[in-house]
């Protein structure tokens, strides 16, 4: 990290632009991962791949109706192969711990193991925690007691599981990584399902260790994302001071495909015009925000591709592919 930009080991500025390749967060074996990664890099011109993973699969505990008999060894080796595919092609890999709610002790344990595994590969970036939400900024940063726990197997609803849980906070995840000796670049999502970065410019920025490659902040945005604030407060204020990584961004075809989106959230955007898709890519390009389009999987919406022949979706994938190829998009309206 140099100011609000990323530089490589030769002090050249790096602008990460790529794709989020999903399935290892819900499947111990993944869906066509070793086929999708080369296509994303070689044919879609991604210089970065985001790889969501889950700590239960990593440690071989199973989940999502699946069991593992090898203690997670085959899962970890598959991640190794994906990392190698990216490294060999000159691309970066973002290892995303795909958890929701509040950082917990098991998430720190994951990073103690995963960071040690990849600490000698500087092209691996550690995204500490997918989407924090429903906790105050002091707990987000420093940990503390929760009014209610969260079940991160419930991806959308995030239903309450245990009351009285204690979050370790995001700083503890940073410390877990650095405690292994790993100096890899770290990415940390804000509150509001990683939409709200207002706290990091108001006293809650995380602290790196001397020699660490730095911390960038993660922003997730979709047409329904607003949570009472626009782009200026949610991301641009932070972008003036810190590198930003938009690790999830996606346009949708119709509201009814996403039943969890409330009517009030639907009113904020007319998705039929495709204006949001153009404007968000324009915002990213105008501010040189790092980004990975969500999702390079045909059934994980909002989808960049419509099938396993990697046909771009008309409502999102075509624009993502154009942007990755260098086509400029005009920001007509800031939300």
Task: Enumerate the predicted regions with their spans.
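N-terminal carbohydrate-binding accessory modules
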Residues: 1-48, 66, 322-323, 329
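Short, solvent-exposed turn/loop segments enriched in Gly/Ser/Thr/Pro and often Arg
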Residues: 52-55, 192, 294-301
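Residues within well-ordered alpha-helices
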Residues: 36-37, 82, 234, 280
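Extracellular glycoside hydrolase catalytic/binding regions
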Residues: 23, 92, 98, 104, ...
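Substrate-binding cleft and catalytic face of glycoside hydrolase catalytic domains
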Residues: 37-117, 122-134
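Catalytic domains of carbohydrate-active enzymes, especially glycoside hydrolases
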Residues: 32-54, 236-240, 244-245, 287
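Short, solvent-exposed mixed-charge patches
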Residues: 334-335
